[in-house]
């Protein structure tokens, strides 16, 4: 019962924190140039959180002494949407938290929760800013944000409640928490580099130049991208395993 209350509170905190972070870009009126700058910053946050927060946490959960090189998985289908990619990522986060809760170790639960929250907020911010840049209606953006915010809490509860004792032991043996977090890091990098950056840089998935000539990113936008990558690194300084 204590574990159930714990996972319920953590899931609720994830839902509220993620939705509030995503609402921020909607609450401010941006000009077209400023919106593009914010979108680039969001892409930087996605890359930074994947490389500085999620990957280290996932690797640490898998290995303590020896690091092995995992095989890189390639997808032949590039038609996946940004929202779907991040929802899949959020679902993986939920599995990670649900698996951590099943261990009945409070310290493990808190470490995974902190790691997830460090990148859930930037992910929500990046998703909403990209959808705004793409010209989606605000009501539809809120629906996309709600689906994204619900994915991790729902999956964490489903994972926790749906596992039998033997299944929990099996997940512990294969380090399900670490695997799920590394999978979510991959979806972050995919969305940021395949969807967001090509879109704001003026080059779509067809790799043809748009009306702006496909000029790429300006110096200010590159600076925003770098800043977005550095913010998660700075926030994670001092976070000990």
Curated annotation (Swiss-Prot):
Belongs to the ZIP transporter (TC 2.A.5) family. This is Zinc transporter ZIP9. It catalyses: Zn(2+)(in) = Zn(2+)(out). GO terms for biological process: bicellular tight junction assembly; intracellular zinc ion homeostasis; regulation of cellular response to testosterone stimulus; regulation of vascular endothelial cell proliferation; zinc ion transmembrane transport. It comes from the Eukaryota. The chain crosses the membrane at residues 4-24, 35-55, 80-100, 110-130, 144-164, 178-198, 220-240. It comes from Pongo abelii. GO terms for molecular function: androgen binding; G protein-coupled receptor activity; zinc efflux transmembrane transporter activity; zinc ion transmembrane transporter activity. Keywords: Cell membrane, Cytoplasm, Glycoprotein, Golgi apparatus, Ion transport, Membrane, Mitochondrion, Nucleus, Transmembrane, Transmembrane helix, Transport, Zinc, Zinc transport. It is a multi-pass membrane protein. Glycans are attached at residues 29, 175.
């Amino acid at each position: 019962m204590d574990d159930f209350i714990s996972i319920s509170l953590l899931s609720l905190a994830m839902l509220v924190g993620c939705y509030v972070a995503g609402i921020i870009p909607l609450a401010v009126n941006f000009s077209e140039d400023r919106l593009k700058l914010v979108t680039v910053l969001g892409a930087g946050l996605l890359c930074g959180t994947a490389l500085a927060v999620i990957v280290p946490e996932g690797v640490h959960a898998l290995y303590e002494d020896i690091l092995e090189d995992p095989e890189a998985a390639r997808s032949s289908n590039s038609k996946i949407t940004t929202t779907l990619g991040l929802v899949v990522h959020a679902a993986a986060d939920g599995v990670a938290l649900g698996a951590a809760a099943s261990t009945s170790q409070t310290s493990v639960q808190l470490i995974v929760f902190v790691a997830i929250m460090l990148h859930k907020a930037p992910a929500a911010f990046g998703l909403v800013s990209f959808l705004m840049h793409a010209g989606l209606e605000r009501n539809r953006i809120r629906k996309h944000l709600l689906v994204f915010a619900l994915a991790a809490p729902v999956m964490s509860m489903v994972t926790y409640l749906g596992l039998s004792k033997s299944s929990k032991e099996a997940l512990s043996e294969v380090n399900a928490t670490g695997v799920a977090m590394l999978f979510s890091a991959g979806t972050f990098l995919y969305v940021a580099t395949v969807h967001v950056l090509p879109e704001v840089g003026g080059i779509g998935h067809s790799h043809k130049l748009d009306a702006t000539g496909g000029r790429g990113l300006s110096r200010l936008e590159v600076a925003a991208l770098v800043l977005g990558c550095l913010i998660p690194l700075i926030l994670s300084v001092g976070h000990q395993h």
